[in-house]
């Protein structure tokens, strides 16, 4: 039987974080829904993938591990995982342990309550556990993005999101697309729901982001998304008759 939910983890060199994260995912979801974990090992040179396999076997947790031979970036890792996922719904989490899997339960319920099939429940880290410099970078990036896209999302950098797999597969794929999921889903007449989430200190390892790939690279993609939104329009369709 296919799971209702696929928990997607893009991971690069997250040995030491994966074991406790999978344990938390299992604890949070095991009594609430059928689920699988789909991890993309994005060119790690540590034991990230094996740590995930060992932990899932011990727990009896359904797991898929996919591997890129070299690092392709977070968006590609997410895209790879979702293409191989079996769940109707997708929950994306950062693999560093800063997202709290306990938030997924409420976010999934919110997604199921929305009648619009193209829904995205986006996490909002209102009490971030990052350095002041990182928080400043994110605030600038969010304000710039909000000014140009007006997507109604206060925290586009939050990796914790829930949406339908079929919705994601309708989106155009490009590098760094994970930053713009709400804007892309809204473009197809989707509905965005903001959900406050817990944010925690990183357990091990170091962040893969800096001022270059957090802000300036994102600005280039921002103008690409603006162009895409203006060039394409999804019509609102009302079914007036269906014999099926």
Regions found by a protein language model. Name each.
Residues 1-4, 143, 150, 174-244:
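Hydrophobic helical membrane-anchoring modules
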Residues 132-135, 207:
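Short aromatic-enriched loop/helix-cap "lid" or pocket-rim segments at secondary-structure transitions
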Residues 60, 137-139, 143, 148-149, ...:
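Long helical/loop segments within the catalytic core of UDP-sugar-dependent glycosyltransferases
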Residues 158, 169-176:
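Conserved nucleotide-sugar donor-binding catalytic segment
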Residues 1-132, 139, 166, 170, ...:
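Structured catalytic core of nucleotide-sugar glycosyltransferases
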Residues 114, 136-140, 215-219:
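Hydrophobic/aromatic residues within well-ordered alpha-helical segments
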Residues 125-132, 145-161, 178, 187:
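A recurrent flexible, glycine/aromatic-enriched loop bordering the glycosyltransferase active site
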């Amino acid at each position: 039987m296919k799971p209702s939910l696929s928990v997607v983890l893009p991971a690069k060199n997250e040995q030491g974080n994966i074991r406790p994260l999978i344990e938390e995912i299992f604890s949070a979801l095991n009594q609430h829904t059928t689920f699988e974990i789909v991890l993309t090992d994005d060119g790690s040179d540590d034991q990230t993938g094996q740590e995930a396999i060992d932990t899932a076997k011990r727990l009896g947790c359904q797991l898929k591990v996919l591997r890129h031979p070299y690092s392709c970036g977070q968006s590609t890792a997410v895209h790879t995982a979702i293409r191989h996922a079996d769940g109707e719904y997708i929950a994306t989490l950062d693999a560093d342990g800063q997202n709290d899997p306990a938030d997924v339960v409420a976010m999934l319920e919110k997604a199921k309550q929305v009648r619009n099939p193209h829904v995205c429940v986006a996490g909002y880290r209102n009490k971030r556990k990052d350095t002041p410099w990182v928080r400043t970078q994110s605030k600038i990036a969010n304000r710039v993005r909000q000014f140009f896209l007006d997507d109604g999302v206060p925290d586009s950098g939050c990796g914790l999101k829930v949406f339908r797999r079929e919705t994601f597969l309708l989106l155009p794929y490009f590098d760094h697309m994970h930053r713009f999921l709400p804007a892309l889903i809204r473009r197809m007449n989707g509905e965005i729901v903001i959900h406050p989430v817990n944010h925690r200190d990183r357990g091990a390892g170091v962040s893969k982001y800096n001022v270059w790939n957090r802000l300036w690279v994102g600005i280039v993609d921002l103008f690409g998304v603006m162009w895409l939104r203006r060039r394409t329009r999804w019509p609102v369709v009302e079914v007036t008759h269906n014999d099926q």
